[in-house]
Structures are given as structure tokens and as C-alpha cells.
Amino acid sequence: MHTFSKFKQYYYGIIMSQLTRFFLLAFFYYIYPVEIFPQDIPAFTDQQLIANPTDAWITNGGNTYNQRYSPLNEINTENVGSLEGVWMTHLNGSGIGARFSGEAQPIFYEGIIYVITGEDDVFAVDIDTGDIIWTYEANLFDGIEGICCGWTNRGVAIGDNKVFIGQLDGQLIALDKDNGDIVWSVQAEDWRQGYSITSAPLYYDGKVITGFAGGENGIQGKVKTYDAETGEHLWTFFTVPNPGEIGHETWPQDSEVYKYGGAPVWQTPAYDPDLEMLYFSTGNPGPDFNGWMREGDNLFATSIVAIDSNTGEYRWHFQQVHHDIWDYDAPNPVVLFDIDINGELRQGLAQASKTGWVYILDRTDGTPLIGIEERPVPQDPRQATAATQPYPIGDAFVPQEVDIAPEGYPELVNQGRIFTPFWTEGTVIKPSHNGGANWPPSSYNPNTGILYVCATDRMSFFRGGEPEEIPPRLEGRFLGGRFGAVPNFISGVFAAMDMTTNRIVWQQRWADRCYSGSITTAGGLTFVGRNDGRLTALSSRTGDSLWEFQTGAGMNSPVTTFNYNDKQYIVAYAAGNTFAGSEKGDNLWLFTIDGGISDISMLDSMSGLENFDLSSSDMANGNTIYASACSFCHGVDGEGGHGGGIALMSASNPGYVIDRIRNGFNAMPAFNGVLSREEILDVAAYVTNELASQ
């Protein structure tokens, strides 16, 4: 009589249940033949778009208020410890290359998960099985230049039986939800002129709106809106105004620098159908670090902007940084909410910025809800600096000055405080140009009034005063100076901010940058990813960590949650990120309570890799190869070495280790063809059995 291990019994049960399900379905469809297609995706109403998501997640922000809040509470603080994987699907290796980053938040509707990779490939995945239903392959031109901040895509939009995507090459495309075929496509902007699309489009009222990245490439920022049915262009709003438009007077009148003045829109706008307004924040003006070329406040750069959702006409703006010379753009998505302030219900808006502040405004007219003071700041006439800057009342969620000067850099000026000017001699300043709150989305709980912000604490060295050509050279950047993060002084900050006071409720400091974004739920949980591959669930009230799961690649995108067949699920896309230095992957995970997969090591037999057996591998030979080829980067004992490789203490999944040795990831080279199959297995055996067991 054979005795099955618990592990084998688990997979035997899965196989038998799937076979039973298959034959029952086959018999049913033999008797009652029907065609199987995904359910229709409607032209969503305004009420559907602003509702808190329950049985679906139909917009990038959960709703068009961009709150990323779920009213579901089946998964909660009491049972989250039992949260386990249901399945993990590989997305055909898409987006694993060194240049790509996985930042997309999945969409879910009627049993189908829609996700896009850093290669702009789209996958429709069956929630019941994890099977890929269809794939759209973008086949991007490999020679695209001028992409800022990695080849990435932050999500898709759905509506009217279509899946909408923006691509790095400047195309806006509508796909058939049944098969991924192109319904229509438009060349919204030209990548050769510095434009790209990295954000998820927004579907609303039969329209699709998208912004454009490229603020370092000499673009003229804008958002464009199209007819969702036909792709017809409806209107454009320029974030750097043309002559005769509101705000053009804040640019030099004797120069065409405004045509290359930046102010990109990095993220998906928010939408309030009752006020008939769209809201978004903008990036820095260009050239970034040479202010004398663009004297004036430079509207609408580094601003929050509201426009008419029907016509695109200007409604109001609030500029966070006047005449920005620090690259303090505002890529974090705008969040809308209604909140009680001093006994009065107000229609609010919040945006967490690179400056380290949350800007809280009345979304009807752009006036501050909490208070924002204009204060004098240090001056440098060579930079044509603004006389004052806005200072929100409340707490900064990251430090805004340098406590101790870093070794090897010039003496601090003004203690490296925010808004310290610089010129050709350069200086160190906090926050960094890529500190504070970057693109990773914030989440908001409407019941508590708490905004959860994912941020980075770091300092940068700024140098300005370099002239730029007008028009800019197409093959170069339009910076007007130099910048660089000061190494070894980087940490992550995850903060809970009270929107009635703009004060910190609680705060966590991480050893690495926070680069994923979050969602928050009525179950008292806030989910946020980590660069080392962990998906974590925190107590929304205290910030305590209640659960974590190793996903096998950098967890650098927000997760999605929904109810399906009376059960709450969470879907996570773990693909790594070049800027975060995290491991690359193509892993799409589904989780629920008692899902069955308690650890990634249980996936060995389902990984899709070729069959392997490490039992006869030569670990001594693996040790020898590791010492000569791997230890410099990963450390003699797998603790992480001078070459910047990750620590290997958690590398216990043989299939995963073999895949990484064979194919490489990030800066790690591929050893397929360099090492024989037996040598790869020897190294994998040594890593998983010796190093990972420490």
C-alpha cells in the first residue's frame, strides 16, 4: 500500500478535482452546447464609476475618486493570517527584461482579470483556473528612446466591451475584450518627440482620457480625450498653455521655451461626475534645473489642475511649487473624498507630493481646506527663483532637510532644506528629486479620513546652469543641469495621514524605498508591496504587520481586491522594478482565505519549468561554481555582496532559482549556455539546500 505525503496529497486532490470538473463541464456542454465568452463589459454609468468596488474593480483607482478603498471585510485583521495563494500564473515571460518594470494594478470584471506588463503586453486571465484566455502583444520597437523612468505601464481601462491601453510608443489602443484584437488605435503622440504613455487611461462617459510622460525630454505637457467607441479625438488640454490661454503669461514672452516646457501628466486622472470635473497633477517644468531659461511661475507645471470633463476647459489650478527647479513634480494620483472639516461636510481633494507634503484642497474651487501658507524662500537670481513657496499646514511625511552632511559632497547650504537654490557649484538637498511620494498610488479610507502614503526618504545632489538648445535635440534630455541621488542614504516611509488635520497618525520606516502603492479595506487592512517580493497586510489603525507572503519577484504594484462567488479575493502582480532594484518576474497571484498555497515553495511542480531533480546534484561542485561566479554579488554565505546582488536566505524554491540562474534578471547575467545543465542544477542545489537553510 502506497503512502502519499501531505504535499503529494495536496496536488493529487487538485488534479482529481480539476479532472472531475473538466468531465462534468464537458458532459454538460455536450448536452447543452453553448459558446463560452467573457461577460459583456458595459458602458459604465457615472454611479458605477464612483461607487466603492465590491464585485469588480473596474477602474485603475478602484473608483474614479482614485480612493483604492474596498468596503469588503471578509478578509480582516482577525483572519488575515490564513490568507493563502489559490494559484500563480506566469505571464509568458513578458516584462522580465532588464529595462522593464511591473507597476500595473490589475482590473477585474465578471471572472476575468486584465493586467498589462512593462512590455505593454495585455493578458486576460480566468479567475477560476489562472489560465490565460487571450494575450495582446504590443511588439514595441526596440529602439524607442527617451523613456523616462523605465519601460513600464501602470494599468488598463475597461468599458463598452473594450480594454483600453496607452503604450510607450505614444499609441492609444482599444482592444476587443473577447480576444484582444485591436478595435481601433490612434497615434496620440510621437515618441520621437519625447512623448510616451505610462499611465492607465481613464474611461468615463463614453470617453477615454490619457496623459503623457516625457517631462525630461522637452515635451509640451497635455491630456487628450477620445471617443471610446470610435477613437475620434475630442479635445486637448495643454498643461503648458499656448499664447492667449490662461497661464501663458507665466512663461517668457520672448521665447518658445513653453513649447518644450514639460509639465507631464504621469497618472490616471480622478473624475467627479456631479461637478463635471477631471482632476490631475502635473510634473516639473523644462528644462528641469535651469530656471533662468524660463523665468516666471511656469504654469501649470508642478500643479493640481481641474478641467471641465465635457469640454476640457480650464476650471481651476493650485501650484505646489512655483518655478520648480528641483524636479518636485507631482506624479502621485489625485484622490477625491467628502470629509467633515470643523463640523462642515466639504468636497475634498488630496495629492501627496515629492515635496513630502499632502496638499488638501476644496475640489470645487481649488482653495486649501486645511491651510497653505506662502512663505519667503532663499533666493538666487541666476535661477530666477520664486520669492515665495506654498507651505501646507500640518506634517511632512518625509524629512525636508539634511541632518548631517554626507561625506564627499560640498558643504551644506541652508542645511540642505527644501527650496534651497543651486547653480553650477551644486548642493545636497532633501527631499530628493525622486524622494517624497512618487508614482506609487496612495489609498484613502472614507470611513476614517486616513490617507496612506508610500514614500522615499533620500537626498539628491543638484547642479544647474547648463544651457539647452531650443528646440531641444531629439536624441537628448532637456535638463539644464545635473542631478543624482546620494547613495547609502535611502529608506522607505509608509505613513498614515489624517485628512482633517494633515497630521501623521502613524509612520513606518523601511530599509528600502516604498515603491508599490497600497489599497485599504473595511476589514481594517492596508495592503502594500515590498521590493524583496513580500506582499504585506498592515493594520490600518496601527501600521502593525499582520501577514506577509513571498511572491517570488519585486512586489512593486498595488494589489486589487473584490468579491467573486461570495468570497473575497486579492490579485497581485509581482514583476519587479528597475528603479527599485528588485527582482524581475512575471507572476500573477490570486489569494483568498485558506487558498491552499501557504508558501511559494509549494509551486515547484506547477512552475512551468522543465522537469528537474536535484537529489543527485553535486553540491560541492555547486559550491565551487558559486564561489567563483556568484559570491561577489550575493556574498560568500548568500548574505548579499559588494556587487549588489540580493541575499539568498529565502531562495528556497528550486524552480525559481534555476530559472534565475538560467535566464538572469536585473543586472544579473544569464548563465544558460555558460554553465551546463548539470552545473546549473549543482548551483541551484547548493543555493537552496545550503544557503537558503541558514
Locations of regions flagged by a protein language model:
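Blade/loop signatures of beta-propeller domains
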Residues: 42-86, 242-246, 409-422
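Electrostatic cytochrome c docking/interface patches
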Residues: 44-45, 603-625, 641, 694
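Repeat-blade elements of multi-bladed beta-propeller folds
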Residues: 57-61, 99-121, 146-171, 196-217, ...
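Extracytoplasmic beta-rich repeat domains
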Residues: 89-105, 135-157, 185-200, 217, ...
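C-terminal capping alpha-helices of c-type cytochrome domains
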Residues: 166, 661, 673-694
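Beta-propeller blade signature
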Residues: 222-232, 297-311, 492-498, 586-594
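Blade-level signature of beta-propeller repeat domains, shared across WD40, Kelch, NHL, RCC1
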Residues: 560-604
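Gly/Gly-Pro-rich "capping" loops immediately C-terminal to redox-active cysteine motifs
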Residues: 623, 635-674
